């Protein structure tokens, strides 16, 4: 019976690690493509794209840092308490960087439709950089809070003398912190605020489009574009909520000493990380300029491959 449990655990770990690696690769490639698209297409270099790039950087960090660390933590390697805690905090930083970038995007789109006349004077480039810097600062402070004392060090000290342990997220991070501070304060509340902002955006746009704007074709076109952009960005927000809420609910339920199956926990973690590879797909499907530039890049890559193939064939023929 014990051997069966060990085999089952091994298969779960192998499946989890394989899927994490695939998600990480897709997240890095997809979001690097987003940044490449912005670099190649000057028409995409709008103020909103600064925030989209910030979100892409957070998602790249998930693929490069968070997923490898999550795999290391899942293997329960023996290490010092604070080394394990720091690794766990890094996982949290980029979660909050994503949510703060989404909040920044929502606020920016709201200002765009609400302050149409004063928009350019209010949203200067300097203010946008300051806002982005504030978002990342908050993300680091919230994510690193357990390092300043809100952790399970005292609980573990009373039950074991050694400062080393088998590293596991829940062994070092307090569920009080996860549920009340990380989830409710810095994930759930921003999600509710963003939903209210987007509802107001759609309400403003609908009112403007329903008004008799005959002779104001440019104004109608502006609000039509804003409506399409808002729908696309709201889909990004919806996917974030869909991917992160299951894991947050699992943590919330665990707070009341309910036993969660390992499979459910792994699925929750995988789903949360999978969100990092979804945004490039949304941009490709929903934002025309992104889609067009994606196709240009793919065409250029195919032409390069064809050219390389022709060169190698020519060399073989010459020989």
From Swiss-Prot:
Major location category of this protein: membrane
Cytoplasmic topological segments: 39-49, 108-127, 200-232, 286-319
Key word Protein biosynthesis present: no
GO CC entries: neuromuscular junction; plasma membrane; synapse
PROSITE patterns in the cross-refs: G_PROTEIN_RECEP_F1_1, G_PROTEIN_RECEP_F1_2
Subcellular location: Cell membrane
Source superkingdom: Eukaryota
Presence of keyword Cell membrane: yes
InterPro entries referenced in this protein's UniProt entry, alphabetically: Adeno_A3_rcpt, Adenosn_rcpt, GPCR_Rhodpsn, GPCR_Rhodpsn_7TM
Transmembrane domains' residue ranges: 16-38, 50-73, 86-107, 128-149, 179-199, 233-256, 263-285
GO BP terms, alphabetized: calcium-mediated signaling; G protein-coupled adenosine receptor signaling pathway; histamine secretion by mast cell; mast cell degranulation; mucus secretion; phosphatidylinositol 3-kinase/protein kinase B signal transduction; positive regulation of calcium-mediated signaling; positive regulation of inflammatory response
CDD domains assigned: 7tmA_Adenosine_R_A3
Glycosylation sites: 5, 13, 161
Entry keywords, A to Z: Cell membrane, Disulfide bond, G-protein coupled receptor, Glycoprotein, Lipoprotein, Membrane, Palmitate, Phosphoprotein, Receptor, Transducer, Transmembrane, Transmembrane helix
GO molecular function: G protein-coupled adenosine receptor activity
Known role: Receptor for adenosine. The activity of this receptor is mediated by G proteins which inhibits adenylyl cyclase.
PANTHER family in UniProt: ADENOSINE RECEPTOR A3 (PTHR24246:SF2), OLFACTORY RECEPTOR AND ADENOSINE RECEPTOR (PTHR24246)
Protein name: Adenosine receptor A3
Source organism: Mus musculus (Mouse)
Gene: Adora3
């Amino acid at each position: 019976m014990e051997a069966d449990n060990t085999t089952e655990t091994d298969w779960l770990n192998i499946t989890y690690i394989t899927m994490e690696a695939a998600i990480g690769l897709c997240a890095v490639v997809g979001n690097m493509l987003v940044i490449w698209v912005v670099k190649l297409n000057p028409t995409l270099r709008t103020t909103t794209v600064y925030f989209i790039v910030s979100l892409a950087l957070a998602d790249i960090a998930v693929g490069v840092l968070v997923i490898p660390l999550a795999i290391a933590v899942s293997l329960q390697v023996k290490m010092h308490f604070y080394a394990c805690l720091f690794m766990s905090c890094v996982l949290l930083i980029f979660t909050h960087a994503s949510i703060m970038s989404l909040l920044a995007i929502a606020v920016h789109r709201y200002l765009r439709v609400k302050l149409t006349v004063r928009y350019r004077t209010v949203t200067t480039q300097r203010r946008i950089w300051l806002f982005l810097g504030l978002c990342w600062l908050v993300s680091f402070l919230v994510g690193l809070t357990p390092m300043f004392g809100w952790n399970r060090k005292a609980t573990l000290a009373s039950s074991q003398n050694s400062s080393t342990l088998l590293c596991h997220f829940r062994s070092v991070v307090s569920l009080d912190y996860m549920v009340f501070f990380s989830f409710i304060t810095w994930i759930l509340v921003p999600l509710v605020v963003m939903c209210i902002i987007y509802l107001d955006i759609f309400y403003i746009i609908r009112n403007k489009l329903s008004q008799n704007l005959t002779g104001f074709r440019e104004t109608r076109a502006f609000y039509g574009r804003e409506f399409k952009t808002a729908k696309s960005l709201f889909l990004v927000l919806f996917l974030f909520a869909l991917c992160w809420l299951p894991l947050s609910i699992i943590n919330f339920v665990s707070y009341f000493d309910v036993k969660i199956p390992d499979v459910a926990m792994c699925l929750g973690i995988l789903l949360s990380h999978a969100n990092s590879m979804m945004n490039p797909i949304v941009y490709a499907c929903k934002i025309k300029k992104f889609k067009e530039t994606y196709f240009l890049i793919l065409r250029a890559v195919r032409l390069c491959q064809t050219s390389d193939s022709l060169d190698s064939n020519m060399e073989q023929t010459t020989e």
